[in-house]
Curated annotation (Swiss-Prot):
Protein role: Allows the formation of correctly charged Asn-tRNA(Asn) or Gln-tRNA(Gln) through the transamidation of misacylated Asp-tRNA(Asn) or Glu-tRNA(Gln) in organisms which lack either or both of asparaginyl-tRNA or glutaminyl-tRNA synthetases. The reaction takes place in the presence of glutamine and ATP through an activated phospho-Asp-tRNA(Asn) or phospho-Glu-tRNA(Gln).
This protein's name: Aspartyl/glutamyl-tRNA(Asn/Gln) amidotransferase subunit B
Lineage: Bacteria, Pseudomonadati, Thermodesulfobacteriota, Desulfuromonadia, Geobacterales
Keyword terms, alphabetized: ATP-binding, Ligase, Nucleotide-binding, Protein biosynthesis
Entry-linked PROSITE patterns: GATB
Subunit structure as annotated in this protein's UniProt entry: Heterotrimer of A, B and C subunits.
EC number: 6.3.5.-
């Protein structure tokens, strides 16, 4: 039997506030265990939560960027369950009145566009974490409560995705948006952006969803895709054998590429939500929403369209007329797009700048332990100066790449490197003509073959002249003189 895949995603994004959602403790990652705690996040008797206003603003940002409606009256609820890393015995979250509802994101997979619904976005606090002893024969686990009370947004999609590729496209777009908004650092390995996937199968043509399995806390796009693919195969095999899929929570094992049961439906929590009596409702006014809307950055989709638009100024900045591929690569990160725009502002040849940013700049960063563009020692101003030297003919494109590598290593300006290393391009016709004559004189056989119709040898002659000039000869002058002499 053929089956239709049904996928819904729950994404937890850890917010980049300096302090926690209900107390003033730091949210810095990697601190000594239990060093960023207080009576509130330790759940001590009598400690009362105080809401961090920035969390609400970040939630509004996320809602506006994902086409949600913003709930005007927000209530926090207690989600009751026991776990060693949850000191209060409950988690403060939102239940029936989430801050954002009824949104959507548009994705594209293999040229096909599709709208994925977003059911809700709600604010909540994170739990602590268990640290398991990595010692043979020791089964102890320790509790680190530094993460307890860290602010989260849970973004819940509709079950609208019908393939692993659609799920990944949605996740990557959401990941890009929260990073553009500056509300999450997007670090999957550190758990700043983590995902639970609900996967089920139904017969093709049916409109009744099958029994779903929930795949928990997967921390990379690669593993999310692997987990969903495995789960599809597992459920299909059960159904083909006449069995029934059990509703359960499953964990993905990246070492084996498989999922294993964590708990079944009968073990599922009854969270017994009720309004938190220690927190008053949060009222969000239209003025507040519009103030947040006015501070939103240009989002990836709009920036991509602007980068591809032809000429002139458009809403959000300048249009550059770039190919779709270039725009897609440059918009991948807000910082990379800004680096490109800052360089074009100083050297207004967008395609040339795009080629260099996607080529030499990205290559150098990748070779340097995948450094971020923010850490690039070649600033937009330095890159623009290098490109100006190339445009003026002071150096050739080949020499420019050599100069760039030196700039990256030393942070020096291109002009200084060119001067120190004597790399100024030779454009003197007389000097280049002497080199051309010498090359032709030394290679009479190749000259005869070229004149006999083997025109592919032209590149050989160019290479010989460039070698003789140590790469300094102006290629345009070399080509012109060679053509003139070989065809005379």
């Amino acid at each position: 039997m053929k089956y239709q895949v049904v996928i819904g995603l729950e994404v937890h994004t850890q917010l980049t506030t300096n302090t926690k959602i209900f107390c003033g403790c730091s949210t810095r990652f990697g601190a000594e265990p239990n060093s960023q705690t207080c009576p509130v996040c330790l759940g001590l008797p009598g400690a009362l939560p105080v809401l961090n206003q920035q969390v609400v603003e970040y939630a509004i940002r996320a809602g506006l960027a994902t086409n949600c409606s913003i709930t005007k009256r927000n209530v926090f609820a207690r989600k009751n369950y026991f776990y060693p890393d949850l000191p209060k015995g409950y988690q403060i979250s939102q239940f029936d009145l989430p801050i954002c509802q009824h949104g959507h994101l548009d994705i594209e997979v293999e040229g096909e566009k599709k709208r994925i619904g977003i059911t809700r976005i709600h604010m909540e606090e994170d739990a602590g974490k268990l640290v398991h002893a990595d010692i043979p024969g020791v089964d102890d686990s320790c509790v680190d409560l530094n993460r307890a009370c860290t602010p989260l947004l849970e973004i819940v999609s509709e079950p609208d995705m019908r393939s692993p590729d659609e799920a990944i496209a949605y996740l990557k777009k959401l990941h890009q948006i929260v990073m553009y908004l500056g509300i999450c650092d997007g670090n999957l390995e550190e758990g700043s952006f983590r995902c639970d996937a609900n996967v089920s199968l139904m017969p093709v043509g049916s409109n009744v969803f099958g029994t779903r399995a929930e795949l928990k806390n997967i921390n990379s796009f690669k593993f999310i895709k692997q987990a969903i693919e495995y789960e599809i195969e597992r459920q299909a095999e059960i159904l083909d054998d006449g069995g029934k899929v059990v509703q359960e929570t499953r964990l993905f094992d990246p070492n084996t590429g498989t999922t294993r049961s964590m708990r079944g439906k009968e073990e599922a929590h009854d969270y017994r939500y009720f309004p938190d009596p220690d927190l008053v409702p949060v009222i969000i006014s239209d003025d507040w929403i519009e103030k947040v809307r006015g501070g939103l950055p240009e989002l990836p989709e709009a920036k991509r369209a602007r980068f591809m638009s032809e000429g002139g100024a458009v809403f959000g900045g300048s249009a550059f007329g770039l190919p779709e591929y270039d725009a897609e690569v440059l918009v991948a990160s807000r910082e990379l797009a800004q680096y490109f725009e800052d360089t074009v502002a100083l050297f207004p040849q967008a395609k040339t700048v795009s080629n260099w940013v996607m080529g030499e700049v990205t290559r150098a960063l990748n070779d340097d332990n995948n450094r971020s563009i923010a850490e690039c020692p070649v600033t937009p101003a330095l890159l623009a100066d290098l490109l100006k030297l190339m445009e003026k003919g002071t150096i050739s494109g080949k020499i420019a790449k050599t100069v760039f590598d030196e700039m990256y290593k030393t942070g020096k300006a291109s002009e200084k490197i060119v001067e120190e290393k004597g790399l100024v391009q030779v454009s003197d016709t007389g000097a280049i003509e002497a080199m051309v004559d010498e090359v032709l004189e030394k290679n009479p056989g190749q000259v005869a073959e070229y004149r006999g119709g083997k025109e592919t040898l032209f590149g050989f002659f160019v290479g010989q002249v460039m070698r003789a000039s140590k790469g300094k000869a102006n290629p345009a002058v070399v080509n012109e003189l060679l053509l003139k002499k070989l065809n005379s």
